[in-house]
């Protein structure tokens, strides 16, 4: 099955700053610390579906 595009949203402000290719068969949501240009700092970003 092909990879599916999902967005990574900032947990602080809620903006969707990054898109990634992810396997749709995973049950857990990806969590990564990345830079949010709206908050101006590194924050936790979670996968949205």
From Swiss-Prot:
SUPFAM superfamilies: Zn-binding ribosomal proteins (SSF57829). Pfam families: Ribosomal_L33 (PF00471). One of its GO terms (molecular function) is structural constituent of ribosome. GO terms for biological process: translation. It comes from the Bacteria. Keywords: Ribonucleoprotein, Ribosomal protein. One of its GO terms (cellular component) is ribonucleoprotein complex. InterPro entries: Ribosomal_bL33, Ribosomal_bL33_sf, Ribosomal_zn-bd. Transmembrane segments: none annotated. Belongs to the bacterial ribosomal protein bL33 family. PANTHER family: 50S RIBOSOMAL PROTEIN L33, CHLOROPLASTIC, LARGE RIBOSOMAL SUBUNIT PROTEIN BL33B. This is Large ribosomal subunit protein bL33. It comes from Lactiplantibacillus plantarum (strain ATCC BAA-793 / NCIMB 8826 / WCFS1).
